[in-house]
Amino acid sequence: DVMFSNIMVGRDITKSISMDLGNFSSSYSLLIGIPQGVASAMSASMLPSVVASFTDRDYDSIYDKITKTLKTNMFIAVPSFVGLFIIGQPIIKLLFSRYNSVQGGMMLKIGAIAVVFYTLSTVTSTALQGIDRVNVPMIHSSISLAVHVVLVFVLLKFSALGIYAVVIGNATFPILIFILNLRTLYQEIDYTMPYISVFAKPGISALVMGVFTWLSYKGMYTLTSSNVLALVIAFMVALITYFGPYYALTKMRVFE
C-alpha cells in the first residue's frame, strides 16, 4: 500500500489513490480472505495428526492426511475462485456500493486465483510444520515476499496497471510459497501431490457451475434489472450445479 501510494503520488494522480486502496483493501481483500480463513482452520486441525504420524515415522499416513486436507480445501477454494471470477462485480456492487464495482470486479478476475494458491500454501506450510520443519515456511515466505516487492515495484513503476499491479502481486505471492513448500516436502518425506485427484473433481464441477451461474445471473438480471434477485438465483443455481456434478464424479470414482 505504501509503495503504491508513493509511486502514484509521484505521477500526480493522488485523487484516485484513496479510492483504489479502499476498493482493494475492502472489497477485494475481504472477499478473497473468506475462503482463506476456512483453509487456515482446516490446516490447523491437520497439524496434530501429522505430528503424531511423523513421530511414528508413518509416512503413508502423512501422505494420506496431507492429500485429504488438500482435497477438502480445494472442494471449497476452487468454486470460490470461479464464483468470484464470474460474479465478483455484482457481489461487490451489492456489498460495497460505495466502491467502484467495475474496478473491484476486474480485481477479482485478475486476482481471484489467489484463493486457490493461498489455500495450497497454507496447507503445505502446515504440513512442513508437522514434520518438524517449522522455520522453512517462514523462509519460503521471505523469499516470496522479496520477489513480490520487486515485481510490484516494477509493475507500478514501468506500467500503467495502477492498483491492478498490487492485485497481481497479491495473487502471485502464494504461488512461489506453494512451489517451494511442495519441493521441500518431496525432499524431506518424498511427498508428491496427486494433482488429478486433488483438482479434477472440483475443477470440472466448478467449470459447470461457472457456466450456469453466469447464464442464470445474466438472464435474471436482464428480466428483472434487480442485482439482488439475480444474485440470489445465481447462488441457488451455483449450489445445484456444483454439488450435482461433484457428487456424480465422486460416485463414478473416476479420479480416485
Locate predicted features:
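Helix-loop junctions and terminal segments of transmembrane helices
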Residues: G37-L70, S125-A127
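Short membrane-interface helical motifs at transmembrane helix boundaries
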Residues: F81-R98, F153, F158, M220
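Transmembrane alpha-helical segments of multi-pass transport proteins
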Residues: S197-V254
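Membrane-interface junctions at transmembrane-helix termini in multi-pass inner-membrane proteins
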Residues: I113-I143
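Short alpha-helical transmembrane segments in multi-pass integral membrane proteins
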Residues: K65-I86, I163-E188, G203
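Membrane-interface helix-loop junctions in multi-pass transport and translocation proteins
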Residues: N135, L145-L182, M193, L215-M236
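Transmembrane helical elements of multi-pass membrane transporters/channels
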Residues: D1-P48, A52, M209, T213, ...
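Interfacial segments at transmembrane-helix termini and the short loops linking adjacent helices
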Residues: D20, T67, F85-V115, S225
